Each structure stands twice: as C-alpha cells, then as structure tokens.
C-alpha cells in the first residue's frame, strides 16, 4: 500500500522486526533500508574493521542477542562473559521499564547500565532495542554507544537526499 501512494523506501526502527528483514525486503518493489545493515556499515566505517573483529556488547532483548543481528557480542570476552550476560539482563529490565511507561526510572538505570558496560572497555556498545534508544536520549557522551535508530535516521535522510 505504501508503494502505491508513492513511498520510495521503507525503514523499520525496530531491531526485532529485522528477524524478518529478508522476507520484508523480498516482498517490496521499493528500497528497504535495513537498520541492522546500516548500523553494521556505520560501525565498520568508524572502526576500520568488521564487527566480527571488534569487542562489542549488544544491549537488547534475549531474542535479539540470540539471533545475533549484530554478531556474537560475547566474542573476545573470555572470563568477562558472565559480566556481559549480566549486563544484558539489566538491559532487559530497562526495556521493561520503558514498556511500562516508567521512563525516568529507565533513564536512571540506563545511565548506570552504560557506565557498567563501559567499565569492560568494549570497542562499541550497541543499543539493540529501540526501547533502549528512547531511554538514552541525550545522556551519553562519546562515540562508543551506537544507537541503531539514530544511524537509521541518518541513512534515511541520506537516501532521501540522493534519490
């Protein structure tokens, strides 16, 4: 339907929806701007290497971690894997707070979560759930926290300007 009214591209700002991104893209006759693909490209451009060569921590729902949308976040962590797993469980609690409308508590927990995550010195921290994006608006300084929603917005603007 969007195609019939002149939409030139579709983007979905939800990591979980990208489980079906190939099905979605194959069903379209217009461009599908994949949040996962543009985020992986962004990280590659800013780190000079593929994500598989970086120590990353993906924060998100367990399903997103298991599906490895952004690669295997426990790679290269050795004995710190239990800490990474615990951090990801804390991310789920932030997501639950956002979904229940408790944004101020979610923002507080999110700040603590990112500080704890940074203590492990990852190359990148990826917000693998759009609820985490909404809980993190403007509270982070630095380039280590990657918000796929922000990357997707930039990619959509770039697509629009170039089409």
PLM features per residue range, with description:
Residues 1-163:
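Non-catalytic structural scaffold of enzyme domains
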